[in-house]
Amino acid sequence: MMLIRVLANLLILQLSYAQKSSELVIGGDECNINEHRSLVVLFNSSGALCGGTLINQEYVLTAAHCDMPNMQILLGVHSASVLNDDEQARDPEEKYFCLSSNNDTKWDKDIMLIRLNRPVNNSVHIAPLTLPSSPPRLGAICRIMGWGAITSPNETYPDASQCANINILRYSLCQAVYRGMPAQSRIVCAGILRGGKGSCKGDSGGPLICNAQLQGIVSAGGDPCAQPRVPVLYIRVFDYTDWIQSIIEGNRTVTCPP
């Protein structure tokens, strides 16, 4: 418990001095303390900050660009200043990346699977999230959450995790905003067309949850965040479920989808 308190104190510092290269939830509200049992926070003492999702007792899914030296992983956290009795701390044992020589890699290979150094115990505030059984539906209302900035471009960070609802949008809308996006990729385009809500700095690697399934991983967005008609790019988890399950089942040499 003392280790968790020390790590929580480091997290408070991260939320005060978070790097400006990650992503956050703008326009959200404080999450219900029981609605983000799968949400994890990744950070280190150098100022890196990301989210992630617990998908079983030993594995966390996040964005590849969230890789950092001396990574610490906290689970069961709601508030940086108020400790939950069931918070748990873990270190990464192994990290798996979806490497590719494809020129479009930056658009659809931003995924990292982390095996924890020891299994997590399910508790009141900790439980894994289900992987998707099908891709997200266009127009679906989905949930984002994290400890990312709540203002942009002058970032301020919350004490407690923030949640917001956004919509699955047409891929062509993101393609029109982000120059160089290919005609097709393993990206989910999501946000609010009028702006005002969205993932932002500090939320990278965190979940896009639709119908209680992990459909996306926060990858990239606009700057400033949550601008009208500037959606956020989420890695489409459904396309990687075979890769993820193969690694969990012990196949460490499995290749990513092309």
Swiss-Prot record:
Residue ranges of the propeptide: 19-24
Top-level EC class: hydrolase
Disulfide bond entries: C31-C163, C50-C66, C98-C256, C142-C210, C174-C189, C200-C225
Alphabetical GO biological process terms: proteolysis
SUPFAM superfamilies reported in the protein's UniProt record: Trypsin-like serine proteases (SSF50494)
Domain Peptidase S1, chain residue ranges per copy: 25-249
Sugar-modified residues: N103, N154, N251
Domain of life: Eukaryota
EC numbers, comma separated: 3.4.21.-
Active-site residues, as the UniProt record annotates them: H65, D110, S204
Keyword terms, alphabetized: Blood coagulation cascade activating toxin, Disulfide bond, Fibrinogenolytic toxin, Glycoprotein, Hemostasis impairing toxin, Hydrolase, Protease, Secreted, Serine protease, Signal, Toxin, Zymogen
Position of the signal peptide: 1-18
Activity regulation as described: Inhibited by EDTA, but not PMSF and beta-mercaptoethanole.
Stored InterPro entries: Peptidase_S1_PA, Peptidase_S1_PA_chymotrypsin, Peptidase_S1A, Trypsin_dom, TRYPSIN_HIS, TRYPSIN_SER
Assembly: Monomer.
Family: Belongs to the peptidase S1 family. Snake venom subfamily.
Protein name: Thrombin-like enzyme chitribrisin
Annotated source species: Trimeresurus albolabris (White-lipped pit viper)
Taxonomy of the source species: Eukaryota, Metazoa, Chordata, Craniata, Vertebrata
